[in-house]
């Protein structure tokens, strides 16, 4: 992060020797220092090896060092130093503490912060995503979670993880469901849950997770959560039902620690909060880099004109649903690796279908995925980065210090903030 105050930069240099002394040798020192400074500001626990030093004693030692050098007076003043340069800051008095695993650019984090939560530990492997995360949230996330010892992670109330979908072991030689997850990143979620025992976990994955390997992958994951002492509740939610004009279905699971005695959990239902693309589009946008080619314009016009003659196009320029979903007959576009588009008109085999690439202002956008940006038929251009942020529920204040291509990719890999925020609202209700 390059927008820290002078006090913060001095504090980093001051505590670096202690960080090198009290954390494992393979730790990301930059991430450790940021975590310590945030822990002081938010009154949270330090990341450290508890076998070397007690977290609270180490925290007091660091605060004392900062006080001696005039870098710390009160927590309120230090909180302002840590977060003053950030537009997306947590509350001073946190309602709960969470960790952010496979954090990406922090979409899940924003949903938790909107409910009064404060992040006490974050982890993200991709260096480009780390850059974006650091600039917006003020902390450099830890890297490879497989190298982080669970005992070093600060105490927390909620574990958040948008973990990758990976196949589990089906050899039958394993004694328990947790053993079947070894070698996958879901195993790292489990080992942290078992060591730290947070009250809740919110997990996110692609919709296909429920049917991966004929449902066996999800079955093993849920059983492993039960073995770890948690009661899992899962569902499929669509971002379109939560106030953003994007059709994006994802698998969500809320795992509740069994000893809390909470046997039921209800996912929020906001099906009356639908918006259209026109609600988030800047019609005066004149960025020429968003333009589509004349070839694309002519091809789209040709296909829409033909479909209009066949009465298959509505007046808002959107295709009738039965022709693009049930009948799988319509205009489909496929994005090639070089960024160009290939069109297909007519019947398409189910296995060949990708979601419609073009959207209209009166409808919703297709799912944003990495390396694919929805394009608007009505005004014939690509969505801007800001408009793509809005499709995922991110605030306009969110900033990227990476290329535009990376920004689109990161948003495509992110979660929809609105959905996470709504789920955590319900978690807070049963927590309190």
Task: Report each predicted region and the residues it spans.
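A short, glycine/Asx- and small/polar-enriched loop/turn
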Residues: 154-155, 245-250
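Short beta-strands and strand-loop turn motifs
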Residues: 200-206, 235, 401
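A short beta-turn/loop motif at secondary-structure boundaries
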Residues: 242-245, 359
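Alpha-helical scaffolding within the catalytic cores
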Residues: 187-188, 239, 384
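Short histidine/acidic/glycine/proline-rich micro-motifs that form metal-
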Residues: 206-211, 239-243
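S-adenosyl-L-methionine-dependent DNA methyltransferase catalytic core
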Residues: 1-119, 132, 224-227, 250-432
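Conserved S-adenosyl-L-methionine
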Residues: 142, 230-241
């Amino acid at each position: 992060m390059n927008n820290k105050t002078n006090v913060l930069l001095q504090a980093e240099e001051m505590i670096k020797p202690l960080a090198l002394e009290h954390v494992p040798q393979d730790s990301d020192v930059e991430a450790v220092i940021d975590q310590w400074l945030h822990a002081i500001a938010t009154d949270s626990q330090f990341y450290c090896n508890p076998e070397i030093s007690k977290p609270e004693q180490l925290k007091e030692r660091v605060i004392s060092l900062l006080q001696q050098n005039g870098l710390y007076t009160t927590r309120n003043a230090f909180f302002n130093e840590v977060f003053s340069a950030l537009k997306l800051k947590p509350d001073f008095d946190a309602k709960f503490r969470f960790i952010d695993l496979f954090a990406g650019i922090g979409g899940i984090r924003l949903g938790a912060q909107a409910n009064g939560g404060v992040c006490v530990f974050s982890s993200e492997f991709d260096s480009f995503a780390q850059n974006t995360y650091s600039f917006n949230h003020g902390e450099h996330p830890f890297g490879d979670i497989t190298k982080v010892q669970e005992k070093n992670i600060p105490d927390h109330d909620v574990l958040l993880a948008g973990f990758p979908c990976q196949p589990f072991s089906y050899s039958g030689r394993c004694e328990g469901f947790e053993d079947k997850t070894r070698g996958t990143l879901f195993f790292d979620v489990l080992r942290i849950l078992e060591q730290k025992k947070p009250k809740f976990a919110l997990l996110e994955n692609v919709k296909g997770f429920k049917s991966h390997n004929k449902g066996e992958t999800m079955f093993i994951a849920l059983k492993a959560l039960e073995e770890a002492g948690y009661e899992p509740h899962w569902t499929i939610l669509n971002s379109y039902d939560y106030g953003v004009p994007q059709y994006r279905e994802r698998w969500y699971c809320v795992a509740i620690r069994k000893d809390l005695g909470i046997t039921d959990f209800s996912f929020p239902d906001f099906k009356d909060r639908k918006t259209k693309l026109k609600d988030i589009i800047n019609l005066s946008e004149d960025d020429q880099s968003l333009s589509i080619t004349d070839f694309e314009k002519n091809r789209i016009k040709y296909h829409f004109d033909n479909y209009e003659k066949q009465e298959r196009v509505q007046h808002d320029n959107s295709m009738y649903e039965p022709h693009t979903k049930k009948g799988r007959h319509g205009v489909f576009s496929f994005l090639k690796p070089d960024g160009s588009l290939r069109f297909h008109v007519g019947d398409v085999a189910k296995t060949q279908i990708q979601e419609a690439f073009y959207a209209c202002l009166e409808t919703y956008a297709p799912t944003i995925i990495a390396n694919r940006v929805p394009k608007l038929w009505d005004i014939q251009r690509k969505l801007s980065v800001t408009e793509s942020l809005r499709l995922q529920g991110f605030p306009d204040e969110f900033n990227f210090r990476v290329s535009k291509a990376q920004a689109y990719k990161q948003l495509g890999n992110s979660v929809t903030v609105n959905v996470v925020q709504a789920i955590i609202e319900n978690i807070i209700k049963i927590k309190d």
